[in-house]
Amino acid sequence: MIYFFISSLFFLILITLMFSKNIFKNIKKIKLFSKNNFFFYFLLFVLFIFIFWLVVYTDQGIKVANQKIIYFLTSYFLEILLSIDNVFAWFFIFKSLKIPLIYQKKVLLYGLWGALILRSIFSFSGSFLFSKWHWILYLFGGFFILTSLKFIFFSNLECDNKEENIKKLWIYKFFRVTENINNENFFVKIEKKIFITPLFVSLILIELSDIVFSVDSIPAALSVNNDLFIIFSSNFFAVLGLRSMYLFTAYFLKNFPIMKYALSLILMFIGFKILIEKFFTFSIFLTLAVILIILITTFLINLIFNLKKC
């Protein structure tokens, strides 16, 4: 399987390079959500699953191949769902710094590289830590439950001056930052001094938000399975998917706000799953079934509320 891991990793990097080369050449022509983007992402996703299943089937048989696919899909759904709040963070950052949509694309696409590198580091280091000191996973289990409860009961408490507070961050204390953006430049020279632009500030903040939101998503994926390739590849597609469907995801969350509570319930379920694993083991099929039931139920409830409003 080590050869499969290496070849598959090369495949993912190659696809990313091809994708990045294309999008950076035509940065102003890209739509953050379009039929072409969605078709490309979906085709890549299906192609990967098929190749993954075929190689595992050839090497270890159909039973293991089917199980690995279920592991991948469960990890992928977890990564998507637990990272989806990141989209709200992106909107808040862009709105606060007054970044036009045309330049938001550049930040998200450059940020794709940083997100993949950081999540890869977290995946490998997390897998090592949990294999050496398994009890650390129980700490995350308790953390997941507390986080979900905090979100359910205190999610409506907001600060009134969020947009002003973003300009009081450490970035503004340690760097010279221009008041306005300078086209698509990250750096500008003013009176022989180098300044960073709000566009670069937004890139830094979005990378930091990726780190924050990966704190729960990666341990959650590790609680489902410890296959590094599955964790890495599910992370890859989750990160790529959220960025390629940025506007659609934001629109969906805005019009289906109850879905945010589904994320809390899923996080709570994962927390309990980790804490009671010594007494009761959830099969991967049961785990995936619970996640889908929570999602479908909350979606239908939200849909009913939306229809009643109309």
Curated annotation (Swiss-Prot):
Annotated TM spans: 1-21, 38-58, 74-94, 110-130, 135-155, 194-214, 228-248, 256-276, 284-304
Q: Which Pfam families match?
A: TerC
Report the subcellular localization: Cell membrane
- The keyword Transmembrane belongs to this UniProt entry's keyword annotation: yes
Where is it chiefly localized? membrane
Statement: the UniProt record of this protein carries the keyword Plastid: no
The similarity annotation says:
Belongs to the TerC family.
Q: Which PANTHER family match?
A: MEMBRANE BOUND PREDICTED REDOX MODULATOR (PTHR30238), THYLAKOID MEMBRANE PROTEIN TERC, CHLOROPLASTIC (PTHR30238:SF0)
Q: State the protein's name.
A: Uncharacterized membrane protein BUsg_160
Q: What lineage is this protein's organism placed in?
A: Bacteria, Pseudomonadati, Pseudomonadota, Gammaproteobacteria, Enterobacterales
